[in-house]
């Protein structure tokens, strides 16, 4: 508790949002708020980015495919070391569309507190109508404009080049790889990094890819009012009293539950997201929207304007990419999504220096040698073992209905903070995770223990088998 309370805290401030919209500003009942969804607005940053010269094309040290946070962070650090870098993306000036939430201590550890635009000194978890847990761990929303602007400013100082196109394929030679772009451009580079996220543009997978899916629908909305405290965000709300008069919807939610995640910025501005934690196959967005409509109606939230809406489909778990391979990966394309939670932003930003420093340190050898060394640094055995445990957690969660999920999180958030903090932030490794598992089992109710034993035995055997196989 003491460690948490001394974490850096950014006082809550109302972020700047553009209130101009083509949509109606009339209040909407929850049942019709989807009518207020604005047309997709693509916000761009005003940077004059230096372009890659297609006429003079010496082999680059690094070509980064994709312009998300992790890819830009790697490119920035590699260019800091004086290496030549090109970032290839169809929309290099575009502001990232999704709202990213992080624990404040995660961004503090990376000296990124200036890239937060709102924060809350605590978070709440509603297990059910009679059980609410208060998490004394500051939480924040990432300032997408500021984070990308910070990285692009460094790019300009370091001489990074940009090419606005989509990469279609890559051809490997012994000492370099050549990227083939949709506009016909060929870009040679000693090292290629695929940072395209879940599209997995270039990174190869051999095993059958059958992940779980986290599916969510969210809105940034101006509302008449909402019932949430302004100094707390809602991390999870598993209550289902809003479905009392919708028996068919309640039955679906009993089997495949969803929860509400909410970030209140002011008394009339809030981000609301209905989320399926993990399911296989993933839930339909329309199903999630229907549940969200009923929840907002029950909470008395009337939407006046929707400023943004987002639809997230996040693959979780599944096999790692082929290790090693010539194309490097980071983030979603490298299997770095937390298989039990869907978290990725802080983890991948923290991994960016590892990948970048490995590239800088190993470049100069053959393409295959460099790639093999970098992949080894990104996925050392302790990280692979950690991921196997997280996949075990995901496999258990896949089998839980609403009541089982409630019992699980009642025990989870009742653990010592070092355990649930470390689990959510990928800071626990296998010996600590074993301790986490025993502690969770000991904390759980009798019903939860029986369920873990009944539904976790097969996933546990699978995890042990994979851990032993990784030693071969």
From Swiss-Prot:
NAD(+) binds at residues 62-90. Pathway: Carotenoid biosynthesis; beta-carotene biosynthesis; Carotenoid biosynthesis; beta-zeacarotene biosynthesis. Its EC number is 5.5.1.19. One of its GO terms (molecular function) is oxidoreductase activity, acting on paired donors, with incorporation or reduction of molecular oxygen. Its main location: plastid. One of its GO terms (biological process) is carotenoid biosynthetic process. Residues 1-25 form a transit peptide. Residues 1-27 are annotated as: Disordered. One of its GO terms (cellular component) is chloroplast. Belongs to the lycopene cyclase family. NCBIfam families: carotene-cycl. This is Lycopene beta cyclase, chloroplastic. It comes from Oncidium hybrid cultivar. The gene is LCY-B.
